[in-house]
Regions:
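Conserved beta-strand elements of the Class I
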Residues: 131-135, 227
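A short, basic/flexible loop-to-alpha-helix module at the beginning of a structural domain
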Residues: 117-128
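Conserved S-adenosyl-L-methionine
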Residues: 129, 153-160
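Short, surface-exposed secondary-structure boundary micro-motifs
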Residues: 60, 114-118
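Reductase modules of NAD(P)H-dependent flavoproteins
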Residues: 3, 11, 17-22, 159, ...
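Histidine-anchored nucleotide/phosphate-binding helix
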Residues: 76, 141-155
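Short, conserved phosphate/pyrophosphate- and ester-handling motifs at nucleotide-, phospho-/glycolipid
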Residues: 52, 140, 231
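Ferredoxin-reductase
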Residues: 5-109, 166-168, 194-197
Length: 334
């Protein structure tokens, strides 16, 4: 999930798009793939959402804390007709994920959802009739699973095609469930492919999703809405494939997934700290010059024989030289 983009959409306490929040209690948690867990929460009365949408989840009383904060964004793995709210995620060694794992049944988290999806949101148009083609990798299958189940539940004639790349079958959440759905629904074409090399136990497609794989199963790129979800590199590669096949950009929706990283936030913090440091350094220079000036006035006329004046002059020269070096290294251009 692109956490920075989600933060911009949600904004702060008083900014961003309109949203609604609920406190939801944990019902159960269970592993569903390698390093991947399902968290099932009670669905509040009157809670309505669309398949493929996301929520902002906040730990109210986290057992662990770090600089990443107590908030993350997750797509629904459940479909709107399900009794519970379900989220599936890769587990990483972060304070948020450890706090989530530490939750006991009945303990609550807060989830917030945008009231109206922004333009271009990663969600299925329920009124569309053209085919929907999903190109997903890894945990990017989560919103696709929600949207596919919702579409099949509504018994629409819309054709659905899912290309699902995973390293191994053991790493692939919902693999068995999707195989079962495809076996029972003629409108769903499911093409899983494994990228983990030689897998004797796997008899299906292998290798990354690409134009050749797609064409083998659906022929030429059909007029459709294409949904891409996965790691940033995978999303970029699929965009390039669709562009090369002349698929209109307006027919492509994408959502980047990946482990939460504090690098972006840390970069901002480093930038802020650097700015603060520069300001403090300039302030120190100004104060030093003022002090030197006051010292000169107090001593009277400048005399090279005066050791105090030599010291003051030396300090001033060093400060001026430091300012000049900083000026040149900062890349200043007139």
């Amino acid at each position: 999930m692109d956490h920075e983009r989600m933060r911009r959409l949600h904004g702060g306490k008083s900014g961003g798009l309109e949203r609604v929040g609920f406190d939801v209690a944990l019902k159960s948690k269970a592993p569903v793939a390698t390093d991947t867990w399902e968290f099932r929460f009670e669905r509040p009365a009157g809670f309505v959402y669309k398949a493929g949408r996301h929520v902002r989840m906040t730990m109210l009383n986290p057992a662990y804390r770090d600089r990443g904060g107590e908030t993350r964004f997750f797509s629904f793995a459940s479909a709107p007709h399900d009794e519970d709210l379900v989220f599936v995620m890769r587990m990483r060694d972060t304070a948020f994920k450890r706090s989530l794992m530490a939750l006991n049944t009945g303990e609550v988290v807060r989830i917030e959802m945008l009231v109206n999806a922004p333009h271009g949101a990663f969600a299925l148009d329920e009124n569309a009739i053209e085919p929907a083609v999903f190109l997903v990798g890894g945990i990017g299958v989560v919103p696709a699973y929600s949207m596919i189940r919702d579409t099949l539940e509504r018994s629409t004639p819309r054709k659905l095609v899912l290309f699902y790349a995973s390293r191994t079958p053991e790493d692939a959440p919902f693999l068995v469930e999707l195989q079962d759905l495809a076996a029972r629904n003629a409108n769903l074409v499911f093409v899983p492919t494994m990228t983990g090399g030689d897998l004797p136990s796997w008899a299906g497609e292998s290798g990354r999703s690409d134009a050749n794989l797609i064409k083998r199963h659906i022929g030429n790129f059909m007029p459709a809405t294409y949904y891409i979800a996965g790691l940033p590199d995978m999303v970029s590669a699929m965009r390039s494939v669709l562009k090369a096949e002349k698929v209109p950009a307006a027919n492509v929706l994408a959502e980047e997934f990946g482990g939460f990283t504090m690098a972006h936030g840390h970069g901002k913090k480093r930038g802020s700290l650097l700015t603060i440091g520069i300001v403090l350094a300039v302030a120190a220079v100004v104060v030093a010059h003022l002090a030197a000036g006051a010292f000169v006035l107090r001593l009277g006329s400048f005399e090279l024989s005066n050791p105090a004046m030599i010291a003051v002059g030396g300090v001033a020269a060093v400060l001026l030289l430091a300012k000049l070096v900083f000026f040149l290294r900062s890349g200043h251009r007139t």
